[in-house]
């Protein structure tokens, strides 16, 4: 195993690239009473068109199939329930599908090795029958209809639909009732055999244990030792720079109007340290201009235009990225106008160097504290590894960032020609 150490914090993670292609990260945490493991594949809702390694034909699958596959992974040939197995060992299991990743995870305070064996066993043991796949359509169809009436979900996907013309990130992760009706067991196996090949997967485990012993458990439970010899070719449509629309509103049962506004980032197409540096720069910038100490936050709050539910984030990915602001307001359009005017004034007058120095220290503090949240850290580590980023490279990239870098990045990112507003109004 390779020992990787964070030069600033001293935290250590052990890494091994298994002969199966599986990326294994083991992070011992002395004195911690809980354990966590997350087993993920670089496969999400946007991966609906691809070429399987060794094939020439393009495979196009229905929208929502990655999420559907995640649901079906819990089926067992003997009819048992995976969650019951975890419960028997005191483990709490879960899974999720995002745009770019599917992950299976558990937390426990004991029986870590038994829970880890259970995780590795079921994720490597697909069992799909035509009958069970058909049955799931009704369950997921109900879930889709439920999200159709979920204001938080709709304000978000309407926002993405305004930002993106063609990129599949604008499509609901679960698909539509019509698209999932096209899914059968044969398609599920094809997607599983393509994207759940261990060369496309990463396992991250953390807790108070001996790293060598845990590696032995992992290697003993690896079932498929045949990695792909070539990359999975993922096919995404070309995305123009322009946004698809500027404004969309929808009416749903909510107490107060909800909004999500933001800016499309057209600086995409790369991963690794370059993406990490941009992400840290955007963390600093968004906190500087929208955080609770910012002029615009206090103006909006004092005027009663926002409440405590105001939030913001920068979402970095290889093929798409955006900055989003969300909240509740009696007048979302006024909030949008005030924020975009504020951004224009900052573009004209420049950012504040003292704000930069202060917020940069705040962001570093957030990074240090992230190590205390085992589940959050595990999720972040896995997500970053799939973007070819090492969590432990954070400090080196953080140290490089200057006020000039921040100013340049702000100019690039906050062009109101690429801003949009999504609103949910009460019925």
Residue map of PLM features:
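Charge-rich, well-structured scaffold segments of protease-associated domains
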Residues: 76, 81-233, 272-277, 286, ...
């Amino acid at each position: 195993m390779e020992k990787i150490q964070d030069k600033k914090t001293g935290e250590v993670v052990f890494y091994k690239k298994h002969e199966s292609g599986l990326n294994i990260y083991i992070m011992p945490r002395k004195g911690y009473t809980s354990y966590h493991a997350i087993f993920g594949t670089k496969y999400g809702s946007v991966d609906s068109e691809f070429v399987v390694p060794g094939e020439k034909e393009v495979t196009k699958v229905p929208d929502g199939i990655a999420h559907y596959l995640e649901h079906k992974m819990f089926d067992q040939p003997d009819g048992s329930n995976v969650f019951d197995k975890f419960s028997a060992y005191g483990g709490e299991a879960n899974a999720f599908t995002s745009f770019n990743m599917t992950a299976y995870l558990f937390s426990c305070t004991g029986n870590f090795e038994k829970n880890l064996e259970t995780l590795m066993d079921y994720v490597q043991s697909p069992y799909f029958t035509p009958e069970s796949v058909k049955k799931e359509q009704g369950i997921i169809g109900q879930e889709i209809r439920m999200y159709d009436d979920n204001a938080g979900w709709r304000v978000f996907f309407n926002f993405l639909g305004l930002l993106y013309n063609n990129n599949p990130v604008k499509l609901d992760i679960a698909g539509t009732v019509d698209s999932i009706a096209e899914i059968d067991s044969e398609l599920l196996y094809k997607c599983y055999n393509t994207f759940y090949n261990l060369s496309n997967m990463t396992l991250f485990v953390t807790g108070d244990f001996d790293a060598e012993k845990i590696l032995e458990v992992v290697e003993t439970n690896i079932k498929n030792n045949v990695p792909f010899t070539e990359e999975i070719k993922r096919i995404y449509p070309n995305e123009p720079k322009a946004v698809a629309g500027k404004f969309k509103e929808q009416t749903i049962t909510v107490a107060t109007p909800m909004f999500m506004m933001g800016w499309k980032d057209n600086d995409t197409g790369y991963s690794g340290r370059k993406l990490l540096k941009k992400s840290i720069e955007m963390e600093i910038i968004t906190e500087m201009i929208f955080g609770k100490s910012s002029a615009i936050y206090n103006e909006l709050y004092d005027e009663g235009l926002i409440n405590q539910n105001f939030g913001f984030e920068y979402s970095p990915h290889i093929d798409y990225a955006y900055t989003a602001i969300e909240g509740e307001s009696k007048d979302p359009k006024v909030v949008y106008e005030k924020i975009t005017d504020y951004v224009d004034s900052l573009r004209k007058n420049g950012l504040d160097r003292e704000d930069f120095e202060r917020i940069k220290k705040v962001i570093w503090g957030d990074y240090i504290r992230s190590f205390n949240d085992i589940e959050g850290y595990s999720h972040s580590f896995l997500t970053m590894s799939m973007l070819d980023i090492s969590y432990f490279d954070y400090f080196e990239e953080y140290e490089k960032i200057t006020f000039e870098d921040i100013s340049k990045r702000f100019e690039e990112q906050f062009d109101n020609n690429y801003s949009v507003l999504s609103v949910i109004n009460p019925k």
